[in-house]
């Protein structure tokens, strides 16, 4: 019984150590994680509303409307850094 518990603990420590090594890699920014490739989401200065015809309006150029669930009021957002 004690041998099984000891073996289980050894395996658990080995797995935890392996996961740590995998996640503790280089912190240098590269590839898709690079800030050169990142985009930024920001709120615009306006809100938006859904009309009775189901069309959303109120966002200025370059912004789009986001809302939660079945709400008829939302906030306008934009993405910066998108080609």
UniProtKB/Swiss-Prot annotation:
Extent of the signal sequence: 1-24
UniProt keyword Glycoprotein, yes or no: yes
Glycosylated sites: 47, 70
Disulfide partners: 44-63, 48-65, 59-76
Superkingdom of the source species: Eukaryota
This protein's GO CC annotations: extracellular region
Subcellular localization: Secreted
Gene Ontology MF, one: C-X-C chemokine binding
Alphabetized UniProt keyword annotations: Disulfide bond, Glycoprotein, Secreted, Signal
Physiological role: Salivary chemokine-binding protein which binds to host chemokines CXCL1, CXCL2, CXCL3, CXCL5, CXCL6, CXCL10, CXCL11 and CXCL13.
Name of the protein in question: Evasin P1090
